[in-house]
């Protein structure tokens, strides 16, 4: 597994920063969006952009 830092930008201007271990960048992005949804930041239609960076 690799370590990722994910930044989820919402249409209401909120930036959500999330760190996790995942197999792929796609999986890390999905985990971050789910964590944002659980935190009440917005659903999938509210996401403007998801930026995934692998930490080496």
Where are these regions (language model features)?
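Generic secondary-structure boundary signal with a strong preference for alpha-helix termini
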Residues: 12, 25, 37-40
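A short, exposed loop/beta-hairpin motif centered on an aromatic-Gly-Thr core
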Residues: 14-26
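Short, non-transmembrane alpha-helical segments in secretory-pathway proteins
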Residues: 31-36
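Short, mixed-charge low-complexity intrinsically disordered segments
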Residues: 37-56
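A short, polar/proline- and glycine-enriched secondary-structure boundary/capping micro-motif
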Residues: 28-30, 43
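Short aromatic-glycine-(Arg/Gly/Cys) micro-motifs in beta-strand/loop hairpins
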Residues: 1-15
């Amino acid at each position: 597994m690799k370590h990722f830092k994910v930044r989820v930008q919402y249409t209401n201007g909120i930036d959500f920063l999330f760190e996790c271990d995942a197999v792929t960048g796609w999986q890390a992005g999905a985990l971050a969006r789910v964590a944002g949804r659980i935190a009440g930041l917005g659903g999938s239609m509210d996401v403007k952009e998801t930026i995934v960076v692998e930490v080496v």
